[in-house]
Amino acid sequence: MERNRELIPPDTDIFRVMDGAGDGIPGVFVDQMADRILVSTRGCSIPADLESELRGTGMPVFHKKLEQNQKEAPVQIAGPLLPLQFTAMEQGVRFKIDMAAGYSQGIFLDQRDHRRRVRERSAPGMRVLNTFAYTGAFSVYAALGGAQTTTLDLAQPCLDWARENFILNGIDPSAQYFCKGDARRWLERFARQGRTFHGIILDPPTFSRDDRGKVFRVESHYGELVALARECLEPGGWMLCTSNCRKLGHEDFRRMVAQAVPGFRLTRDPMPPDFSGEDYLKRLWIDWK
């Protein structure tokens, strides 16, 4: 399983090994997860020759069917039984991984380069807000850059997981802020309070429903979200706007974001080199000129 190894940054043991159509196997995705392997399939089974190769590694191999309920955890299909929870490293940063978790195992690998840039763009004295934070990976990188972070998510278990990730990296969670609830309502509250941030990360799910039943759809409401965040941005600050919504094209996404922040500079980074298949991730850096 040495594919893509030369493309991966140092001190990283969690990355994509095979990326579907980009590696000539549409619908099949293989991720190295420290000393475990996760193979995900969409609309197909694992090719027999690939399964044989995976089994030959001697590592625990897990299979996840993406067309099923996205909240179902992967199933181990080969290798020794090791703890389902473990620590992986990305660019020298440690994260808790949980193979028993549904939806995702604790980190989105396609955001690796964005996390590095968040760290580079963070500094002591800065405040960074991470909305829809999941397990707080962006927050950890920002804090390692010296910023004070606010980690915002609707789910308390995600905030607890984020605290664990801070601790894994020698960061005292009590020196950071954690907010539970709907991101839109928190942004409105921050704006009313005059609370601002030097950096804001917006990476919402494609579809969500808050605790009051209010629906959020990226293709309909992302621009409104960016406009709300704009009211909380310090002059000269930056935002990272991303979405994996496949219904929304890159140009439509750019247009939606640009309309919400007229006069701001918009730039787009390439995908990480181990993600060579579908260019599905919409992503824009927004800078206050």
What is each PLM-predicted segment?
Residues A155-G199:
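S-adenosyl-L-methionine
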